[in-house]
Design a protein with these regions (language model features):
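Phosphate-group recognition and catalysis centered on beta-loop-alpha active-site segments
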Residues: 1-251
Length: 251
């Protein structure tokens, strides 16, 4: 039986400055199996890891995709670090058996991630996800990526504004057509019935946003057909890793 896979949100979550090399390093020390982050494609084709849609340049807000790497490296984060590139992250942590999950809003960013991952021989260690704030149908973001690569893991994060998750929100037909392997839901909408439904349909089941001990315990204890929830994301990965190791320690 596989234990639940733990993703550190933007690295070590609420500890330190998110989406930095130091935060990613701290998450690995905590014991996460994967790092969850956001990927943005720059004007020159470089991929950077940050959640910003825009940055200040000459006092004006400029969209990330209109900036180049020189612009990005002039911007300093709160701890003095710069926004990391994907290549910098892959290089920094190449000796670790760590996985990466990237939220994207542009299919071209996903394609570039795949190309860089192949350069580093990490294609089996990456996942590309539709963000939970993305309101459009799955083909708009994943069709182009799936045409480019038939095997990379794709993640359907259910649109956050669906207060009740019905079967239509899962987009099961498109998931099967596009070979999208994972359904990811916010912890507020995760339930045992939904867990069963997703697993019976043949997909992996992820839960994001868990913070509090009670919900962590509930989700890490949940089993269906002898299997735990496949993965969880948290801004408190130290707490989740510790509880996972206690609850699932004999598996």
């Amino acid at each position: 039986m596989s234990r639940t896979f733990i993703w550190g949100h933007r690295g070590a979550g609420f500890t330190g400055v998110q989406n930095t090399l130091s935060s990613f390093r701290n998450a690995i020390k905590i014991g996460v199996e994967g790092i969850k982050t956001e990927a943005r494609l720059l004007k020159g084709g470089e991929v950077v890891l940050c959640s910003y849609q825009s940055l200040k340049k000459n006092g004006k807000d400029v969209l990330i995709n209109e900036l180049d790497i020189e612009d990005i490296k002039e911007f300093k984060l709160e701890n003095g670090e710069t926004i990391p590139t994907l290549r910098e992250v892959f290089t920094a942590f190449k000796k670790y058996d760590i996985a990466y999950n990237f939220d994207i809003i542009d299919p071209n960013a996903g394609i570039k991630i795949i190309e860089i991952a192949e350069e580093f021989n990490l294609i089996d260690r990456i996942e590309i996800a539709k963000p939970s704030i993305y309101p459009h149908p799955l083909p708009t973001i994943f069709s182009k990526i799936r045409e480019f690569n038939q095997d990379v893991t794709l993640v359907n994060s259910i649109f956050l504004k669906n207060s009740i998750i019905n079967e239509k929100h899962l987009e099961l037909e498109d998931m099967k057509k596009l070979n999208i392997q994972v359904i990811n839901v916010n912890f507020n909408y995760a339930s045992y019935d939904l867990f069963k439904k997703v697993k019976d349909e043949g997909f992996k089941f992820y839960i994001w946003g868990i913070l509090f001990a009670r919900s962590i315990k509930n989700f890490l204890s949940m089993k269906y057909k002898g299997e735990y929830v496949d993965a969880v994301f948290s801004n408190l990965p130290n707490r989740v890793v510790k509880m996972r190791d206690e609850i699932q320690k004999f598996n």
